[in-house]
Amino acid sequence: MGASTGKLASERFFRSWSSEDNAKAVVLVSHGLGEHSGRYDHVARAFTANHLHVYALDHIGHGHSPGKRAFVSSFGDLTTGVEELRSHIGSEHPDLPVVLIGHSMGGLIAARA
């Protein structure tokens, strides 16, 4: 199944992929510097095939989110976006655990969020 897209209250863009059957958890993907959520479509498809829902955020200044491209004035701007998406996920899937994964800069963001 393809990705759905949305925007958070902060105008940050995200993609989501849904498992076709009962999901066991939700994976939140945090991408690296200069990347965007669409680069993780193949990863999301593998997770959804294994009964997981997936969400991926375009960090501020990346992909379809607002801001100067690949520029971050404060590291807190990055963790705030992940926290906002995590809250959104909690409202959509209140009974499922959320697992954060990150690549490169996204790993540090996930560890700090």
Segments (PLM) and residue ranges:
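Alpha/beta-hydrolase fold nucleophile elbow
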Residues: H93-S104
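Glycine-rich nucleophile elbow surrounding the catalytic serine of serine-hydrolase chemistry
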Residues: G102-R112
